[in-house]
Amino acid sequence: MKVKLILMFVFLLSVLSVAQQSKLITVIGDSLVGRMVNGESTREVYGNVVLTQGKVKITCNKAIQYISRNEAELIGDVIATKDTLTIKTPHGYYFGNLEKTKSTSGVYLDDKKVILTADSGEYYFNEDRAFFQSKVKLYDTTTTLTSNQLTYYQQQNRAVAVGDVLIFDGENQIFADTLEHFRNSKITFAFSNVRLINLKNNSEIFGQHLEDYRQKGYSLIDREPLFIQVDTTFATNDDGTESVQLDTLFIKSRIMEAFRDSSERFLAIDSVKILKEKFASVNDLTIFYRDEERIVTSKINSVSAQPVLWNEDSQLTGDSITIYLKDNKIKQLDVDGSSFMLSQNENYLNRYDQTSSAQIKLFFNQGKIFRAEFYGNVFSIYYMYDGETANGLTKSNSASTTVIFENNEVTEVKLYKDPASEYYPEKQVTGNEKDYLLPRFVVHKNKPTKIEMYNLLNKLK
């Protein structure tokens, strides 16, 4: 029994010795000089230097080998290889016990999948992991990524970047404080101070967390998202000259989704606020079909609040509101389901023209309303004016109504099918304006403003 134990012990020692020897680095070259430095044995190897450890091979002009530490300093045209991996640097260091190489003199890595460069870097051969710092740049055939720090997991085709991160694929740019990118699946997760720029449609999305699935053409922003799209328009001045105007679309919500497919859809979900030139909206759900220049807002269930839309002095509510754009200006606006429209007079602020119906269609020219059509059980109250002098009001109802506008003022009202109309003189109306309100009349006070949106933008920037 004792003999067996002794033999087993000797065998284990021999295995351990072989394992330790297999981790020892070997350095050869044209010439070798042995030295004792501070009591430590070193070897300086010159000319056609080759360092090997297992599958790792490093060539350079000169190496200083620290024998007891199993380490070596590598000087001049350093090239490290393992399988398809190549690392280049003018000056580096190799840690045999850790199977790690390090350089602070500029590093270049190529594994036939990506190219990675930085001011300094480390590579762990036993883990197939790189850690690069300062002016980091990773690129392949479709994507370029830059950052202050980056960890690259070669076998996983995964990169984790930290600090001033930017990833660019030719059409989209993503900025973030931290970013995780999976090369094969083209999936990216971005965290903190996120900014997604689409160069194709000149739009930007800000937020604190983003998920981007490039192969699916889908992005999700679910923390403090803000969408911005700036359009350049030309306005004709009174003297016939043209001036450039910037028309910015703001959309704020709790969650945003972007689909980069044939429909080019953009979704804003929950607590949505929209602001663009002279119109604004609050709603539960907005779908923006960018290629079709169509925006649809709606409530998400039967008990939720209706979307509200403001256009200049008018306010509209309904179960859904569809905005049709042409050259980034409103062309048509449809309100469906329990529709209500009110317009405040700029000179008599307590007087509102009001219309309730099942459906409303508004038509615009150069951004100004010129016709409104109301369908389904239409009830209306319109205030009358003699010039700028108040002159009573008219209450009416019909199956459908058409209203003609000039300079945003009602000039003609046409009633169709079973019309009924009643006029109330000014002396009966003055001071009693609150008595002339249709059911469902509500003036909403939560209209988004430019100050609110720009303050939010400055906070996110």
Regions found by a protein language model. Give the residues of each.
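Bacterial Sec-dependent N-terminal signal peptides
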Residues: 1-24
